[in-house]
């Protein structure tokens, strides 16, 4: 009998959802940085074997929205509660159990198995961990709690074992050669945005959107033109940097990662444009592929 199902990963920002997703899928699907709100979209990673297909979804961290982009991000997270066969709620040893109580209440009401994963347990001691497990059991009594460390891979195999046991009998939902629902262009934009998150401070990374305007691929190489959109002229100057050095660094590091990702030579040109207040515009967000009510 073949098994298949949707395993959706939810939780607050910066608890290790994307790192866990990449581990479970065995591919670098989601960008992962030390900054919160790195993930903006819902991203599927598909794990295939002869008798099983697990469709993982990484989702944005749950936040109280301050602008329309964050509303879209919350929509992605809430939709993951509706269509899951198994829900992975990821927290960590630092996070308070009552953070984002409204979202936790929605998790409490889901009708599918919930695995509550307490990440980063290498940062605490056994006594505090026991107290944390008890506190989470009170918050989500139906959840099966598994302490993990995504960075050291501790107990990740236990998580995978439970997923396989809980997965429903079903034919595959996608072709067995498919490993994600996203096109190649999406990963280009995410890798460029990852470098911006790493190399710029404060509000700059959160004011950026990346669009691929040209993607031409042949047997050995890919030619890419990408536009980095910011909200203000002052941000454009910061992204470009003195004599273009900052932008050149981003492009160089992105090219290296893209060559590893695609296993081809990459020719990357980057441009910076201003799209005023795009994070608060329904029209622009839809143009950039975000889910709006």
Model-based region annotation:
Residues 27, 46-50, 84-87, 94, ...:
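Conserved, well-folded catalytic cores of nucleic-acid-processing
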């Amino acid at each position: 009998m073949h098994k298949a199902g949707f395993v959706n990963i939810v939780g607050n920002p910066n608890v290790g959802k994307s790192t866990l997703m990449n581990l479970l899928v065995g591919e670098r699907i989601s960008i992962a940085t030390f900054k919160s709100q790195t993930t903006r979209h819902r991203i599927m990673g598909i794990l295939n074997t002869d008798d099983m297909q697990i469709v993982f979804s990484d989702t944005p961290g749950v936040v109280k929205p301050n602008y329309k982009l964050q509303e879209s991000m919350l929509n992605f997270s809430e939709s993951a509660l509706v269509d899951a066969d198994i829900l992975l709620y990821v927290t960590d040893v630092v996070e308070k159990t009552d953070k984002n109580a409204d979202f936790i209440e929605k998790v409490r009401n889901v009708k599918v198995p919930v695995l509550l994963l307490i990440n980063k347990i290498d940062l605490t001691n056994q006594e505090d961990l026991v107290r944390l497990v008890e506190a989470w059991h009170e918050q989500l009594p139906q959840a099966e709690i598994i302490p993990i460390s995504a960075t050291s891979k501790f107990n990740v195999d236990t998580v995978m074992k439970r997923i396989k046991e809980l997965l429903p009998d079903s034919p595959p939902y996608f072709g067995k050669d498919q490993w994600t629902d996203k096109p190649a262009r999406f990963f280009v934009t995410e890798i460029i945005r990852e470098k911006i998150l790493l190399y710029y401070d404060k509000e700059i990374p959160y004011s950026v959107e990346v669009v691929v305007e040209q993607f031409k691929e042949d047997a050995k190489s890919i030619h890419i033109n990408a536009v980095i959109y910011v909200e203000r002229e002052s941000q454009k100057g910061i992204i470009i940097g003195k004599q273009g050095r900052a932008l050149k660094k981003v492009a160089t590091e992105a090219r290296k990662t893209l060559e590893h990702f695609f296993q081809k030579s990459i020719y990357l040109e980057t441009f910076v444009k201003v799209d005023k207040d795009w994070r608060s515009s329904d029209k622009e967000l839809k143009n950039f592929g975000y889910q709006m009510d």
